[in-house]
Curated annotation (Swiss-Prot):
Negative regulator of class I heat shock genes (grpE-dnaK-dnaJ and groELS operons). Prevents heat-shock induction of these operons. This is Heat-inducible transcription repressor HrcA. SUPFAM superfamilies: GAF domain-like, Winged helix' DNA-binding domain. Keywords: Repressor, Stress response, Transcription, Transcription regulation. NCBIfam families: hrcA (TIGR00331). The gene is hrcA. One of its GO terms (biological process) is negative regulation of DNA-templated transcription. It comes from Mycoplasma genitalium (strain ATCC 33530 / DSM 19775 / NCTC 10195 / G37). Belongs to the HrcA family. Pfam families: HrcA. GO terms for molecular function: DNA binding. The lineage of its organism: Bacteria, Bacillati, Mycoplasmatota, Mycoplasmoidales, Mycoplasmoidaceae.
Length: 343
């Protein structure tokens, strides 16, 4: 990444702060009036042209002003300086977390809701629980065509799976499978179930009427570990529609699909596991150029991991978001150690 002079860095930061706040291309006139009263408009235009030439800014087609490029945002993220406003938010977040004694999951949810209300962007909370142990499988008949499987873990988490059936023979196969599962894989870690499925298939083959139906509709869907391992909640999804970048229905639909894509959050978890801090991933790495994702992984004394990810337009307030996520990670891990030492 090319170096900037101190003045160019300050001009870039001012432009990005303005664009984050108002989503309007920034011109030299505004910069002179609001940020650099000691600089002439000509000097600012020259510096902005230099920033554009270096790839940090780009021109807007419908305005004479400039907007940040992805290179500009990446530089901005690397040279963040925490402001007094951000310090105040961090203090408020700490008070929310520590205001009363709660479980780790409850404290995380309190922190997520606080961040969600402050930044007005969706927050994705993903709990990775591949080390959960299966304790029970229950079956609930919904109607003549659908049944609901309830997979209950040792920690009390319940994973729900809806299975369809077309006739009495398929329904009988569902009942047979539940009996076999409860006999054979109870007290097994979810991450180890797939290793036992090959043995189960041979047992099931001799018991059921429609073996291929069982494979496709029950085994494939019931033990989809991507869904079980990544238990996901999305907070504040309504804020997306308020962002001008997502006013187009097609773009909004695309980002909503991204939020529901479990593989994306597993990819983010790998990045966070490798680099134990708050990470910023720009949209071109996820196949969607107009977004960014800020995320962090919270490690607790239990083997479950909690990932927080904030999804927004490329112009989102990285300074504030990064500070809040980092603070939440540090405070939750500190709180977890404290309550663990008390037990």
């Amino acid at each position: 990444m090319k170096n900037l002079t101190p003045r160019q860095a300050q001009i870039l930061k001012a432009i990005i702060n303005e664009y984050i706040a108002y989503a309007i291309p920034v011109g030299s006139k505004l910069l002179t009036k609001k940020y650099f009263k000691n600089l002439s408009g000509g000097t600012l235009r020259n510096e902005m042209a230099a920033l554009e030439k270096k790839g940090f800014l780009k021109k807007n087609h419908i305005s004479s002003g400039r907007v940040p490029s992805q290179i500009g945002y990446q530089y901005y993220v690397k040279v963040l300086n925490v402001s007094n406003t951000t310090n105040d938010l961090k203090t408020r977040l700490r008070s929310v977390i520590l205001q009363q004694h709660k479980t780790i999951d409850e404290v995380i949810e309190l922190g997520v809701k606080f961040i969600n209300e402050i930044i007005n962007l969706p927050v994705v909370l993903t709990n990775f629980s591949s080390d959960e142990v299966l304790k029970k499988i229950d079956l609930i008949i919904l109607d003549k065509s659908f049944a609901l499987f309830l997979l209950v873990s040792a920690s009390g988490k319940v994973f729900k799976k809806t299975i369809s059936y077309a006739n009495q023979r398929q329904f009988e196969d569902i009942v047979i499978c539940v009996r076999i599962f409860n006999d054979r894989i109870i007290d097994t870690r979810f991450s180890e179930i797939n290793n036992q499925l090959e043995v189960l298939k041979e047992i099931i083959r001799t018991k059921v009427h429609e073996y291929q139906y069982v494979i496709d509709e029950i085994l494939f869907k019931l033990f989809d570990l991507d869904q079980i391992e990544a238990n996901k909640k999305i907070y504040g999804i309504q804020y997306l529609a308020k962002q001008p970048e997502f006013a187009n229905q097609e773009k909004l639909t695309k980002i909503l699909n991204l939020l529901e894509d479990t593989s994306v959050w597993q990819q983010m978890a790998f990045i966070n596991q490798t680099n134990q801090k708050t990470n910023i991933v720009f949209g071109d790495q996820l196949g969607f150029k107009e977004i960014s994702v800020a995320s962090t992984l919270i490690n607790t004394t239990s083997e479950a991991k909690h990932q927080l990810a904030i999804v927004g337009p490329t112009r989102m307030d990285y300074q504030k978001i990064k500070a809040l996520l980092t603070t939440l990670k540090e405070e939750i891990e500190k709180y977890d150690k404290k309550i663990h030492n008390q037990t």
